[in-house]
Amino acid sequence: MAGPVIIEAAINGVTSKKHNPNTPKEPAEIADHALRCFAAGAAVVHNHIDAFGLDGNSAAERYLEGWRPVLEERPDALFYPTTNAGPDVVASYAHIGPLAESGLMRLSLCDPGSVNLGGLGPDGLPVSGIVYANSFDDVAHQFGLCDRYGLGPSIAIYEPGFLRCVLAWWRAGRLPAGAMVKFYFGGDDGFLSGFGFQPTRTALDAYLELLDGCDVPWAVAVLGGDVHESGIARVALERGGHVRVGLEDYAGAHQPTNEELVHDVVALAEDVGRPVATPDEAAKILGLP
């Protein structure tokens, strides 16, 4: 039997309350949702704040407003933020240092590649997109912050080239300790749909073939879809992987809470025969510094 499964709850992202009223935005809401997710079985919570483009210290403090109440009750809780959407990689990651220096964050993030993101217009053609760009130098900066502050990188894999970049760092012995790669499959709804592979067994096989021989833990997520209903969560659990859920990614037929989405994966893990990792167990699985 495979070991404990790490469940990450991505609790808000750019999902609006109009789209789902259960989406937390303010720090007090973020704290409440995070506590509920940890109680339900999540080991990691990822969230955005309600402002972009702040200076690093201000952005860090806004995150900590939501994290401190949780860590008072759950000192084992694992959090990590998103980028700060600055004009360059230094500004976009300027909050990582202050968050690490607070002593309240053990994870960071890395997006090791570039990808077109956008939805489909009425004619079915891609429109209103952006190029989310991360050069190899940007990736080096992101990993450098992890090394400097002793943070485990949570690594987004939007396309196969992202994984090849990570593997180059791993083969060179330079991948920071505590890393996890997350295979982001593209769903069929929302601004983050339409990129990369769809959530199928064949697509996961392709990623796992690239990863063959590498011992870095991996997880699956479906952005603009439903990781549970798509079936890819079960396949991942059966193959020893981990799962990310949450209202940042969800675009199913209902308006669930983050807690309910975590419960779905917990039930699936029980059905597959895998225990659910606590935050402390997740830290050991990842080998966090």
How would you name each of these model-derived features?
Residues 43-66, 184-189, 250-253:
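Glycine-rich, proline-tolerant flexible connector loops at the mouths of alpha/beta enzymes
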Residues 56-83, 139-142, 146, 204-215, ...:
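Alpha-helix-loop-beta-strand connector modules within alpha/beta enzyme cores
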Residues 28, 57-133:
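Active-site beta->alpha loop and helix N-cap motifs at the rims of alpha/beta catalytic domains
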Residues 1-22, 112-126:
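N-terminal small/glycine-rich loop or linker at the start of catalytic domains
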